[in-house]
């Protein structure tokens, strides 16, 4: 299982999203995702998050909030432990990203874009800044979400999609 980070950078009611269109054989190809990537040797989640955000966007985070851990289980892709952050305090100029197109998207419009079904669940939970840290397990068959557990308990995720 690989460890990754995912950061949702917010400004003026919008998230900076990455439309993954430049890499072939990418499990996120043509999907809209937050900013992130794989851990390097001996990195903490916070260090990986800051590095990945800078590498992909050119932005430096002054503060990021560690919001949840998502266990991504798939029948076709490598399992992943995704450390999810949000950030509102940052500086720098956005640069071109070699993985796709960076776009500020209204938070309410994200749900109509091609995103992973499970992302809709954790995005709704992290919209509440006071929602406590949580663990979310998402199991997929292909690109179809087939089960979800919040803090170890199965949830009826279809209500949240």
Each language-model region and where it sits:
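Short, active-site-adjacent segments that bind or coordinate small-molecule cofactors and metal centers
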Residues: 129-147
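A positional/architectural concept
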Residues: 29-32
């Amino acid at each position: 299982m690989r460890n990754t980070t995912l950061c949702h950078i917010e400004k003026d009611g919008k998230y900076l999203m990455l439309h993954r269109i430049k890499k072939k054989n990418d499990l996120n190809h043509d999907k809209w995702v937050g900013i992130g990537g794989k851990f390097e040797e001996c990195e903490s989640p916070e260090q990986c998050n800051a590095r990945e955000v800078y590498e992909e966007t050119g932005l430096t985070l002054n503060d990021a909030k560690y919001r949840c851990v998502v266990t991504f289980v798939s029948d076709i892709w490598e399992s992943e432990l995704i450390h999810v952050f949000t950030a509102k305090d940052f500086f720098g100029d956005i640069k071109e990203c070699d993985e796709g197109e960076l776009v500020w998207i209204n938070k309410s419009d994200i749900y109509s874009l091609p995103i992973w079904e499970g992302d809709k669940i954790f995005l709704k939970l992290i919209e509440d800044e006071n929602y406590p840290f949580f663990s979310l397990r998402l199991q997929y068959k292909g690109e179809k979400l087939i089960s979800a557990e919040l803090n170890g308990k199965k949830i009826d995720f279809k209500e949240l999609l």
